[in-house]
Amino acid sequence: MKFLTTGLLATAALAAAQEQQVLQAEDGMGQAPQRGSSIFDETLQKFQSSLEDGISHFWSEMKTNFKDYLPLISLPKKHTRRPDSEWDHVVRGADIESVWVQGADGEKRREIDGKLHNYDLRVKAVDPSKLGVDAGVKQYSGYLDDNDADKHLFYWFFESRNDPKNDPVVLWLNGGPGCSSLTGLFLELGPATIDKNLKVVSNPYSWNSNASVIFLDQPVNVGFSYSGSSVSDTVAAGKDVYALLTLFFKQFPEYATQDFHISGESYAGHYIPVFAAEILSHKNTNINLKSALIGNGLTDPLTQYPQYRPMACGEGGYPAVLDQGTCRSMDNSLERCLSLIETCYSSESAWVCVPAAMYCNSAILAPYQQTGMNPYDVRNKCEDMASLCYPQLNVITEWLNQKSVMQALGVEVESYESCNSGINRDFLFHGDWMKPYHRLVPSVLEKIPVLIYAGDADFICNWLGNQAWTDALEWPGHKKFAEAKLEDLKIVDNKNKGKKIGQVKSSGNFTFMRIFGAGHMVPLNQPEASLEFLNRWLRGEWH
């Protein structure tokens, strides 16, 4: 996850000038954000009288620093769309939407719910021998197209290595916002990694060992995805994910009958409550959603931000990164930070949520980032900030940018990048960063189990914060869950049986795990442990 700091004030998106809708309201984004200071002046004048003095001052500074010709949304990627004739399958959402059936009550209804007429799904059967990635495993890649909005989401599907006719299906989402899920594929939990010589190396701990896995580049303009428009908030992105899954399972009904689980890490702590709620809101669907998994996520900033100081100052199980003076400074800044987040929670307006993110990230996160330590792993220095402290991302990017790879996958953009900073900025300046998406979790828990897991060496979405928000969440099982004690989590599935890999607590449909010796990306640091808890979770343990 990339956290922007106040150094990006001058690049604020005018998207924030449009009032945001409260959570669960209808999506009313209106026209695309414009360039220039005139609309900024007009909108600022409209809202400034209702803002607190500090927040009003923030936006006044924005106006002063604003540049007329600054790009205000992430720029579209160069691309060439392949004709439908080059794809093995094309699924039309309009065809699905036109199918009506007779319900149990005798009334006619659509077979599958949702607005789908504007979506198509293009599918290519990938030849594993051309890429050397999990040879012998059935694979598909392609694009979900929103033809009305000119949006095109790339996906790559791997069938289970074990028993694909019966094994569950898992969707994997990386965070950012703006980071490609193909980084998760090749850096963390996919069937292969890429070595420094650009050779494909098999991963024995891949999550498709006992499940079929879909890696999705979302929102648009992330990874191999592209668009002439943009998505700048989590709710809008959820509509696309629902459409992708619906059309994919329509094309491949053999997977639709199996259990489906949605998973991800980092900013997926925002995505997954919204995406799961979107899927569960549809009564008639072909998505057999059974659970949700969030790894080292940002879900409830109001509860998580107070835990940054303890994690950085030696109270999270690892030596302190910051000196006592800096720790005291973070303590002194916390009250103002939490006040701003509370105001954001109350209004869910970009006018107050953006200042909350900017102030808190500057006062609470920046002191750690200035040390040169890896924000994703408190044990290590940051090797290369340009590659998010993981130089292997450069190798993965180089491999994915090979013409032979792009041709084999049916890619339509000219180049791949692991993370798009423009998307990160767009979400931040739409106020999405600090919004209370955790409020959707109780309704999700009513219908499916949820697992929150956290590597305990991560700073940026640390285990202390994730434990805190899960304990604080208001839901019918709150008291029992909060009172439950962490118990040892040990390996039971292989030759290392009995090895302690973490701690776990569970009550009702809610489970929290602390994974020892893992940073932000648990499958990267502890691949054996991650596959262990995944397999057991998919089998129904802890729920």
UniProtKB/Swiss-Prot annotation:
GO terms for biological process: proteolysis. Residues 18-124 form a propeptide. It is found in: Vacuole. InterPro entries: AB_hydrolase_fold, Peptidase_S10, Ser_caboxypep_ser_AS. It catalyses: Release of a C-terminal amino acid with broad specificity. Glycans are attached at residues 210, 509. Disulfide bonds join 179-419, 313-327, 337-360, 344-353, 382-389. Its EC number is 3.4.16.5. One of its GO terms (cellular component) is fungal-type vacuole. Keywords: Carboxypeptidase, Disulfide bond, Glycoprotein, Hydrolase, Protease, Signal, Vacuole, Zymogen. Residues 1-17 form the signal peptide. It is an enzyme of class 3 (hydrolase). The active site is at residues 266, 458, 520. The keyword Disulfide bond applies. One of its GO terms (molecular function) is serine-type carboxypeptidase activity. Belongs to the peptidase S10 family. Vacuolar carboxypeptidase involved in degradation of small peptides. Digests preferentially peptides containing an aliphatic or hydrophobic residue in P1' position, as well as methionine, leucine or phenylalanine in P1 position of ester substrate. This is Carboxypeptidase Y homolog A. It comes from Trichophyton equinum. The gene is CPYA.
